[in-house]
């Protein structure tokens, strides 16, 4: 594989994209200079010495180096130019930068695809990709190299539209849409999902929330007609096969998972079989195989064009997903080679298709579906010939693909399935029946659903084919049931399926580079010829390249000892103690969203934390406690620390968190928790020497033992508190029970990584005054989590003066409470404290460098997700 010219060309093309994205244009040009220098050196090199035979071999190697470097350099330059043209795209929404990232406008355009989606809160909405032709009254012009301007439009219920309900819109429909256009959200926590980058991989730069949608012209395109037939067929399938089977077939045939039950979808993901629910090369291969069996004539040009047309039509239905495009183009290339009696090479064909895709949109290199698709086919191409010498059974292909995908799926999805190698065989076998049945049923529905012009023919067709469709629907129902049962039986959490932390990028890169080295034909030849020095040199080169890749792609949070996690309007602090121990202080939370499972759990797993040693909860309001409770239910927390006033709520807390009473630790002022032992809590009120010896610890400053506990507990409602970040209703119309809950927030002084952090929950100014009077200089801290998200009612001059933080962090998201208050920000700026905000900068991480500044302050190292 390595000797293929297209391998070197693809390597150069992808390298230019990666270097430009991670290091910038200057670094990309620097690498180009190195390539030119290497090529020039080899070009100027004289003839190597040696006997005739040795001389010929050395001449050949020198020629290969020169030509290989030239190929690498040419494709690298082409890719750099392509990336530059991509970045020169004119932005018709450039005014967004001047309006804080949001503007209201009217756009006219053509629908490219649409579907019904479900938000994290469980509400359905209509999502469309729209090709914009006009913005306001001004047309959108394009230069020859520019991409079409695409908007991702979201329309929620109860908005003024031409649609009586949420119904998918046919591609090709002309719409006039008024709404708010926004810059999509980027990655807000280290190593987590980057929504903005994902949209770029599918050619979308902006998101619009529709306020009004009006249809200008109905769709008359082929794609629109196919879309309508697809929706009608799936609606018909619900009647013959049932809603569950129809939802599964929507995923299997068209890659749309919106109607699959969440538990079923999660089982497929855990079991390593989720690829069956995303239209991929497997589906295209099955379709191609069926067409080949049905075609009885000579497989010449007529067969070539028939297959090409069918694949184009199916690609329309699958919205041209990267895996479908990859498989379809490779099949067309294979057929073309057969018709022209040319040699077909799987690896070279893969490289050709990848180059075509990246030439259109270089950002597609970061598309998960494309990465998995090409990893699978390239692993098959490189490794299957080697393993076929030892084993040729039914598990060969599945095992080889898992060899290529296992580390990647662990990195991206944080799952490892031991059953994937075996269960994929029967799953693919059943898919071999479901895909032809589904497509056959769709083809028959085209005949029945589209009326004819001949009188009586529709009735005849209905009588002839309706029973067939009924039988096919029942068969689909049975096969779908068998498919889900097989998958469910083998998906046993903790036995066949395991949650894992994401492996480091350097390890991931090293694995694939060494896999390529040892399984490629060229690498095996070096080993067989016992060229130990060459093999050792290549291994060192692979490891060095992997280390460089890991360093280049590092987020900067790897060395942070305290991270203020972005959970929106809520508090969450990640404390990294020595010996690899990890703690959270609060965990955010939203009433209608499982933030613990969908935000905190991915954050922890992707940053190397399989399970927290402990979690501290300041108080039981939703925006502090709910995320932690949800994380506990996922089995991610060993110990839970709360205020002792909550002791009589032990049963309720255990029910909400799924933890046992033995795992709850109740705290009060004067106690210290050692971060070396999460189960240890000791009163150190009169033992300052003991506390000083605990270098990494949590000191509980508030509330005092039994403070107002009886009053507070009498007033608390059952379940989660509902403060949600409001400053006790900003002191208006809020019941006193919410104020009492805030007043009894656990106030913690945390010492970790050479830094001190004062976590203040949602206390108000009166509480801060009491703390200032009691502790005075004992409040001195490096980092301050500003109380109550920066509410104007949570400012005390004395408290701030004694705390004297080097950095004040406001944990806020989008809100209607006016957080953070401008005067509070100015007050901390006046005290020369650095200001950091989750809503503007995403996650914020702090570490401490050796030595103090000239002013006696610690040297803080600060890293943020957003600039």
For each of these PLM feature ranges, what is it?
Residues 622-658, 805:
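Active-site HxH/HxHxD metal-binding segment of metal-dependent hydrolases
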């Amino acid at each position: 594989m390595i000797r293929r010219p297209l391998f070197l060309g693809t390597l150069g093309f992808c390298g230019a994209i990666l270097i430009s994205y991670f290091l910038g244009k200057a670094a990309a040009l620097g690498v180009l200079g190195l390539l030119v220098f290497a090529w020039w050196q080899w070009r100027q090199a004289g003839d190597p010495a040696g006997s005739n035979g040795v001389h010929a071999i050395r001449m050949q190697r020198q020629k290969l180096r020169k030509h290989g470097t030239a190929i690498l350099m040419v494709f690298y330059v082409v890719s750099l130019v392509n990336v530059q043209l991509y970045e020169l795209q004119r932005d018709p929404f450039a005014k967004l930068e001047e309006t804080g990232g949001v503007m209201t406008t009217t756009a006219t355009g053509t629908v490219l695809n649409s579907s019904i989606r479900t938000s994290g809160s469980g509400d359905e909405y209509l999502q469309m990709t729209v090709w914009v032709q006009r913005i306001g009254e001004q047309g959108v012009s394009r230069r020859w190299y520019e991409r079409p301007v695409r908007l991702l439009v979201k329309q929620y219920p109860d908005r003024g539209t031409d649609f009586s309900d949420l119904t998918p819109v046919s591609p090709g429909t002309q719409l006039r849409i008024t709404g708010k256009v926004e810059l999509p959200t980027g990655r807000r926590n280290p190593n987590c999902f980057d929504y903005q980058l994902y949209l770029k991989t599918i050619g979308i730069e902006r998101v619009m929330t529709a306020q009004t949608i009006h249809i200008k012209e109905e769709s008359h395109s082929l794609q629109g007609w196919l879309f309508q037939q697809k929706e009608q067929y799936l609606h018909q399938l619900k009647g013959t096969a049932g809603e569950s089977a129809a939802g599964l077939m929507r995923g299997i045939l068209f890659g749309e998972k919106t109607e699959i039950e969440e538990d079923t979808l999660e089982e497929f993901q855990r079991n390593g079989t989720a690829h069956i629910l995303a239209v991929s090369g497997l589906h295209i291969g099955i379709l191609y195989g069926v067409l080949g069996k049905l075609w009885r004539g000579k497989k010449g040009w007529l067969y070539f064009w028939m297959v090409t047309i069918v694949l184009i039509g199916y690609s329309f239905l699958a919205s041209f997903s990267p895996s479908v495009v990859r498989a379809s183009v490779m099949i067309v290339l294979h057929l073309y080679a057969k018709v022209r009696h040319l040699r077909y090479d799987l690896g070279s064909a893969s490289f050709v298709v990848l180059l075509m895709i990246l030439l259109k949109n270089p950002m597609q290199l970061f598309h998960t579906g494309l990465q998995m698709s090409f990893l699978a086919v390239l692993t098959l191409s490189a490794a299957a010939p080697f393993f076929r010498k030892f084993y040729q059974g039914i598990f060969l292909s599945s095992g080889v693909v898992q060899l290529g995908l296992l580390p990647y799926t662990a990195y991206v999805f944080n799952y490892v399935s031991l059953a994937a190698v075996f269960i994929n065989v029967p799953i693919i076998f059943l898919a071999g029946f479901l895909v032809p049945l589904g497509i056959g049923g769709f083809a028959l529905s085209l005949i029945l659903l589209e009326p004819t012009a001949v009188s009586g023919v529709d009735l005849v067709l209905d009588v002839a084919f309706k029973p067939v469709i009924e039988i096919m629907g029942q068969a689909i129902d049975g096969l779908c049931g068998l498919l889900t049962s097989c998958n469910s039986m083998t998906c046993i959490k903790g036995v066949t399926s395991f949650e894992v932390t994401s492996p480091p990028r350097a390890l991931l890169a090293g694995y694939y580079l060494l896999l390529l080295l040892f399984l490629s034909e060229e690498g095996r030849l070096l080993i067989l010829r016992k060229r130990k020095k060459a093999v050792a040199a290549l291994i060192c080169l692979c490891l060095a390249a992997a280390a460089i890749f890991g360093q280049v792609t590092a987020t900067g949070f790897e060395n942070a000892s305290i991270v203020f996690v972005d959970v929106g309007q809520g508090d969450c602090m990640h404390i990294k103690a020595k010996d690899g121990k990890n703690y959270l202080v609060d965990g955010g939370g939203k009433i209608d969203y499982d933030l613990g499972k969908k935000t905190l759990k991915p954050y922890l797993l992707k940053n190397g934390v399989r399970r927290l040693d402990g979690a501290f909860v300041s108080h039981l309001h939703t925006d502090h406690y709910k995320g932690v409770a949800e994380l506990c239910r996922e089995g991610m927390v060993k110990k839970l620390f709360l205020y002792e006033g909550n002791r009589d709520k032990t049963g309720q807390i255990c029910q909400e968190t799924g933890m046992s009473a033995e795992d709850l630790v109740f705290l009060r002022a004067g106690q210290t928790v050692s971060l070396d032992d999460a189960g240890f809590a000791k009163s150190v009120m009169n033992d300052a020497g003991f506390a000083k010896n605990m270098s990494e610890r949590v000191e509980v400053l508030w509330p005092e033992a039994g403070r107002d506990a009886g009053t507070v507990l009498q007033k608390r409602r059952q379940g989660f508190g509902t403060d949600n970040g409001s400053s006790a209703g900003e002191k208006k119309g809020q019941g006193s029970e919410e104020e009492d809950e805030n007043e009894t927030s656990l106030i913690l002084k945390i010492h970790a990584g050479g830094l001190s952090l004062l976590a203040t929950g949602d206390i108000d100014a009166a509480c801060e005054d009491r703390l200032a009077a009691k502790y005075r200089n004992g409040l001195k801290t490096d980092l301050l989590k500003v109380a109550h998200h920066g509410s104007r009612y949570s400012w005390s001059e004395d408290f701030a003066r004694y705390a004297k933080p080097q950095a004040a962090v406001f944990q806020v998201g989008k809100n209607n409470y006016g957080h953070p208050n401008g005067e509070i920000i100015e007050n901390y700026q006046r005290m020369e404290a650095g200001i950091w905000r989750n809503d503007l900068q995403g996650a914020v991480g702090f570490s401490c460098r050796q030595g103090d500044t000239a002013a006696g302050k610690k040297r803080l190292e600060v890293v943020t997700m957003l600039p």
